[in-house]
């Protein structure tokens, strides 16, 4: 790697480079738009120094990508290490959000149209997509949503996930995290599992 470009950075730019490296490694995804619909300073800086980030991260086995269509920058480990393992509830939530995001895009919405409330999310999961038999407890729900928030899959637009009216913005990074074909495959598998569990519970509760 040539450090010529890095050496040309002033002290403030070097500090910002270090900060942005730590940020994207912790968050995985860097959407262009902030919750206030301004341009993210991390996105702007990484984009402006993209070749430098690309070379630097490659040294430790990472690739950085810039998806201009979705307006998101993200990283992947070359060997497939450091993948985030999601529990069952978080997986159900992110699949539901991915389906909602795609629905809104198909309806002609913009990349920033994926705004829902916690209550609407749960209604979709329970009634429409049949992925949950009932509302999960608040602690598990909040933990799952916080994981997605930490990785810039969603933005929390209101104060508290406990509130069913709390607004959540589904970010375009969800389309990178879960491609459409994979989403459908996982959804069908999860729904089949839920239907099987429901049938087993009904059998256990029946009297011949």
Regions found by a protein language model. Give the residues of each.
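Eukaryotic partner-binding/assembly regions in large regulatory complexes
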Residues: 1-80
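Short basic alpha-helical hairpin corresponding to helix-turn-helix/winged-helix-like nucleic-acid-binding
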Residues: 54-114
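Short acidic, hydrophobic short linear motifs in intrinsically disordered regions
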Residues: 31-40, 110-126
